[in-house]
Amino acid sequence: ERRELIRRTWGQERSYGGRPVRRLFLLGTPAPEDAERAEQLAERAALEAREHGDVLQWAFTDTFLNLTLKHVHLLDWLEARCPRASFLLSGDDDVFVHTANVLRFLETKSPDRHLFAGQLMSGSLPIRESWSKYFVPPQLFSGSVYPVYCSGGGF
């Protein structure tokens, strides 16, 4: 499983140069295509949360279209639970992060100033094929080209 691999590699919780690093996994509820396994997946997520203490789960369907909602919940949680946190790195579970390099980069930045770093994307087109996980219906975004944005794997 990807989360376990992250826990054992780059996502180990430890202190880097006296700075504690916390790892969290964000989950919603199983998507409709996982309905027949929903109960099993929920039990596994609850067990994992108890065992590792690093799983946050909210009551919304965990789909690509709800990714913004997932991040809004994370920011609310962070403000309530980690008010002294200086930086947040959000990334997908299919990326590798060189934690020490990220921290070296952040050491050059002031925690008193806003920072948003990532791969800047421009000229991207919305996917209109309904079978794609990246499908964006025209009712949600009617434009033909997205405004400039930072892309995930990590931002």
Locations of regions flagged by a protein language model:
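Secretory-pathway lumenal glyco-enzymes, predominantly type II signal-anchor Golgi glycosyltransferases
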Residues: 1-155
